[in-house]
Amino acid sequence: MGIVALILIKAAMSLILSSFPLFRSSRSSPASASLAGSGLPKTTPPKTASLQSHSPMFEETKGRIAKLFKKNEVCISTYDTAWVGMVPSPFSSDQPCFPDSLFWLLDNQCPDGSWAQPHHHSHSHSPSLLNKDVLSSTLASILALHKWGLGQHHIAKGLHFLELNFASATDNSQITPLGFDIVFPAMLDHAADLSLNLRLDPTTLNDLMNRRDLELQRCTENGSAETEVYMAYIGEGMGKLHDWESVMKYQRKNGSLFNSPSTTAAAFIALRNSDCLNYLYSALNKFGSAVPAVYPLDIYSQLCIVDNLERLGISRFFSTEIQSVLDETYRCWLQGDEEIIMDASTCGLAFRTLRMNGYKVTSDSFIKVVQDCFSSPGHMRDVNTTLELYRASELMLYPHEIELEKQNSRLRSLLEQELSGGSIQSSQLNAEVKQALDYPFYAALDRMVKKKTIEHYNIDDSRILKTSFRLPSFGNKDLLSLSVQDYNRCQAIHREELREFDRWFVENRLDELEFARHKSAYYYCYFAAAATFFAPELSDARMSWAKNALMTTMVDDLFDVTGSVEEMKNLIQLVELWDVDVSTECCSHKVQILFSALKRTICEVGDRAHQLQGRSIRSHIIVIWLDLLHSMMKEVEWTRDKFVPTMDEYVSNAHVSFALGPIVLPALYLVGPKLSEEMVNHSEYHNLFKLMSMCGRLMNDIRGYEREHDDGKLNAMSLYIMNNGGEITPEVAILEIKSWNDRHRRDLLRLVLEEKSVIPKACKDLFWHMCSVVHLFYNKDDGFWSQELIEVVNQVIHQPILLNHF
């Protein structure tokens, strides 16, 4: 029958039993005693009362993060500022147009003679990987000052730094900025023409020049649109060979070339284009005497804050600020703002964030950006950009988005090549890429992803184009601190809930049942809830989910493995009658315990829901359970009678018998919004349930085909093969069933994200959470194998995050 709890349990129960404990309860029993002894770390969570409010430090950190939305700060680029400093006055070629930029260079040289920025120096224990960027910035600054006869002492110190650190120019362990192998040698040639005396290691210099020649040869022979744009982007490194007139076709409405101050400055030096000059004036008017590596970058900067908050699990504290950013981004998207549609990272991030937050954005603009990326300046050489585009391309909602699916495959291949080739120099980024490839967004539990994101959070994070740059949300210690505090706070609550769950299990005598040998079952049932909707205020919903999940597991065992037909019918009759004397009406000890526990659980959940909803919903929960029991009984009868249903008959029953109804539907009443009787009778409610359940059912049928075929049971796989005359192979059938599942999953996500909806968004989210659960455990061909699951559960429930680990 395959239900979500069994997905978690049955694959390798012996291994699970040997690896997991459950907490001791006040009532000692053989079951609870055996659950207590394991290798999991023992933790004592703080008392619940202490978890109800945040510390002053927590609130202060929130306040500082909220201010990020108002600043739009970016780090200054020495490299780009130096190129702006080289720009001559439009009125006199002998005078600098932007003398303040030159004064900034004079004021910002480092004691070692370089023009490094703070982010060039590692804040972790690992050495900096940005030395090539520092070399470029330093040499560009020297050239700018020398051009106008300024800072002879600064120039001498800078030249000395270059001589001492020149070996980094060919160090393959260093991160190479885009175009470095062309631009840096070109600047060295220019320095030689100016008789700047650089005593450089000849071996390293020859190696560097050979790299330049090979890169230029490759670009010349390639002749593709990608290469043409790439060469335009690094135009300042092409010198007199460059046809600047042809480059101007890439000029944007704001006058820039690629929103790059350095490229735009070089273009003005060559052509005296007034729009280029106006762009540079605009940048300096905004930032003062120095410029960033990319301008404008406001939309991307704001979206990065939103994305970091969401991925770190703390977005719920900034809902007002986030809503404002999303509304403004959507307005810019509809207007075709160049800051979005002309920048791959911004477009990918905007598309993903807007679509996942319910804004109606078509994939057309995004697809064009992805296609253009292969003819854009090095975007596919930037792993961060490729990863962002890949994440966005996963969000396929409509049947006609075939091109989006193609681009998703293409981007996935690129990331796989980067991963297998070992070319990702940042260990954090490498882990992030691996996580994205291993677990699609629809097959990753929220808490698992949040923990990984926190662990991969890089306090030295920066982006690399021609030069490196940072944003306020990159490596922000406040974001890291708040996310760790919140994660550990929620985790402590989850551990306390698990203790309560343990008591409930024993108090309901479920440990006495023979199939309770699967002691770890309830551990996993709770984990699925805590790992998907984690907020402290959702405690009642988590407990309802977990308890009903465990009950469905045990009922499924009765119908699928251990029970007699008499016991099955007796249990159904007891639920239908409800008010019965269990001492006389139950046909077995097993049924008595099951029914008593089920009744108590339904009443308990119903009472909690009554308090929130202001009306009784107990009868609805009973109906949900009866629907499941009748569907399970029908499958037993089909197998007994060797009845072959039509596919429609099978689907009609099988989506109910997959047993997600009692887990998800009662919990909807406990997440906050009011659910009226009209809502739960609406077609949208039933569509959400069916789509979610069919995803699980189809994946289960693929995985369980051989076993159920051997047991004489039918499922979607066997019916599909039969309906095709038995002439297709199981491998072909698997591909078809997987395509059905893909359609159901996309339809479900589209319905969940639909803004104009009958069912409240908080309730719809639970359907998607469960869909993610079942996809996770069927994500890999061999299933989410038990040892891996053990490790994930251990991390999510038991291992707090320690800040000193980062």
From Swiss-Prot:
Record-linked SUPFAM superfamilies: Terpenoid cyclases/Protein prenyltransferases, Terpenoid synthases
Gene Ontology CC: one annotated term: chloroplast
Region (Disordered): 33-56
Tissue: Highly expressed in leaves, and, at low levels, in roots, stems and flowers.
Residues given in the record as Mg(2+) 3 binding sites: 700, 708
Family: Belongs to the terpene synthase family.
Name of the protein this chain belongs to: Ent-atiserene synthase KSL4, chloroplastic
Gene name of the encoded protein: KSL4
